Amino acid sequence: MSTEPAGAVEPSQAPRRPRGRPRKTADERDDGNRRQELMRAAAKLFRAQGFAATSTRDIAAAVGMHSGSPFYHFKSKSAQLAGVMEQGMHSALQRQAATLRAVQASAPAGAARSPDAALRALIRTHFDILLGPDSDFIPVMLYEWRSLTPKQRAAIAKLQHDYEAAWLPLLLALKDAGRLHADVHLARLLLLGALNWSVQWYDAKQAASLDDLADAALALFIPH
């Protein structure tokens, strides 16, 4: 005779306890839009407050997340910093490539693009990347380079190299035409260094327009 009470559930029929992590919240599941919101918020806070002074809690609060939710998207605050820089460089590369295509498309049929026009376009795009709307990503890279790990730094440096490589053919063409007298590698370093420094002093409410800046930079480095 069975000693179990009537209606008892066999072990094989008992409901199983869920295993693994608890079910993700909406903030944690939406890995696309929410991740981008985190990236933009992190870029803005890292630029305004600095990497060391910004906590993951600050970033989560900026987008209305719980304090632990960012860790479903990034392993650490350091990984988020590297992600901000990587996204900034990928965006910069895409915008630069689009600029060069537009310059080539605007050249007369069968003619090569003007190195002056192409360089001016690159300078203007670079200013927009640094100073235009949603422009926190690259300034964070300029400010917080030393906060990266060596492995992160190497990955971002590869993207930087690819971005800067597009400037060299234009400077070489200008040198061949007698318009540039400096070593092209040094000229590129000095030019980009001067443009990048604009994040320290530019004020859109008081300073010249980005077009004015591009014209002035071209005239300074490649005088007529």
Predicted regions and their residues:
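N-terminal intrinsically disordered/low-complexity leader segments
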Residues: 1-33, 100-107
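Amphipathic C-terminal alpha-helical segment
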Residues: 128-132, 140, 164, 173, ...
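Amphipathic alpha-helical packing segments from all-alpha helical-bundle domains
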Residues: 90-97, 132, 136, 140, ...
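Hydrophobic alpha-helical connector segments
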Residues: 83, 97-136
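Generic hydrophobic, amphipathic alpha-helix propensity
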Residues: 34-43, 59-60, 84-96, 167
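Short, structured helix-loop boundary elements
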Residues: 35-36, 56, 78, 82, ...
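Helix-turn-helix
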Residues: 37, 45-79, 83
